[in-house]
């Protein structure tokens, strides 16, 4: 391929992206950043560059990050034994302190530092800042051996009760990129760990975001999980229940899709589940005709 051919290919890519850039300029896009894309340094940098490109063309990105693997690693390093009930971690006071340290003190700082190093204007927040996320202890009930429902205390695992998005709106309007850790405050003064997908979805609803992107370690929704070419590129909200009943949406994909459905019902324009392991996945999903993941819309 000659230098001219390479240049023409780049020009075609830019022209393909142009109508999408024009369409999304001035719009709010909430990005849930998690999975393998948080662990691989090269992918980290590519995600940050994608976010900065969105910001540079007038799109308003808001980032909400997870950090489960990093929390697990830190618990192991400090010798903190984890206790589980029905597969769910019990988050006691010490575990919550470690989770806050990792999410707010380490990961959030790393993300904003990387964005700023590449020329961005990123500001780190937790859900406790300006009472962005208010939570209560998440009630959990499980069926015991007698078939009766009983309450289970998982500690400082929270359920979002209220979102106060004013601080995020203010930062976005001033040209900053908010980066948010999923740690919420409660009226009892305690900190609560919030599922990052849920936190991102609730923030997207509160902002009435035009798009909500979930970076995952899967391509999206596959009609056949054994066939990577069976990706469902578009799913309507009213098709979700049927696909769950058919088993097309199953296992760990169900809570992500339910999160997508809740966001749509809360006024978000569209939700995208995409594979964050693919370099520049965000740009490929938003700025190309075919996209690379599954888009949910009303």
UniProtKB/Swiss-Prot annotation:
Subcellular locations according to the entry: Cytoplasm
Major subcellular location class: cytoplasm
EC number assigned by the record: 2.7.2.8
One Pfam short name: AA_kinase
Listed GO MF terms: acetylglutamate kinase activity; ATP binding
Assigned keywords, A-Z: Amino-acid biosynthesis, Arginine biosynthesis, ATP-binding, Cytoplasm, Kinase, Nucleotide-binding, Transferase
Coiled-coil segments: none
Site feature (Transition state stabilizer) residues: 32, 256
GO cellular component: cytoplasm
Binding annotation for substrate: 67-68, 89, 193
Family of the protein in this entry: Belongs to the acetylglutamate kinase family. ArgB subfamily.
Name assigned to this protein: Acetylglutamate kinase
Classification of source organism: Bacteria, Bacillati, Bacillota, Clostridia, Eubacteriales
